[in-house]
Amino acid sequence: MKEVLSLLLVFIGILFLVGCGKTEKNVEGSLSDLMTKVYDGAGVSHEDMETVELNSENTPFYLGDVSFSFKEGLASEPIMSSVAHSVVLIRLNSASDAEKAKKEIKEKVDPNKWVCVSVDEENVYVESVGDLVILAMDNQNGEKLKDSFLNLSK
């Protein structure tokens, strides 16, 4: 009887732990709409920004020479400016790939990719919410953009 009761308590404990596990849900919406929300939430103007869809040819410029695949990506950078600024959103194939993707982006992205300007290493932010990853590089507004992105899940 004690064995049955012990097994039952263990089983209930496992169900409790699994049932209360944190599951991070994906952020819904088009990357274009989400990009606008990130800028607006950070209070950063995006009027003079150009958005570019990522493809196999331009991905190394925006993310570095990464090896992971993703469903879609969108980059936002100034059309013409002497300010180093880049925001990239990518939707991964699976949220389970987020940690690997963030690590690889952080290692391979070039914060000195512009001709006359650069972003300090401490102002390169790579975060994720579900299957969505942001790379924000900006010496003045990078942290605001990162925080705005993280608020998309709330």
Question: What do the predicted segments below correspond to?
Answer:
Residues 1-5:
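Positively charged n-region of N-terminal signal peptides that target proteins for export
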Residues 7-13:
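Sec-dependent N-terminal signal peptides
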Residues 15-19:
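C-terminal motif of bacterial Sec signal peptides marking the signal peptidase cleavage site
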Residues 21-23:
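Bacterial signal peptide processing site
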Residues 27, 31-78, 98-116:
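Surface-exposed, low-hydrophobicity interaction/linker segments
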Residues 79, 117-154:
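A short, solvent-exposed beta-edge/loop patch
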Residues 84-94:
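A short acidic-to-branched-hydrophobic micro-motif
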Residues 95-103, 142-145:
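Short, conserved charged micro-motifs
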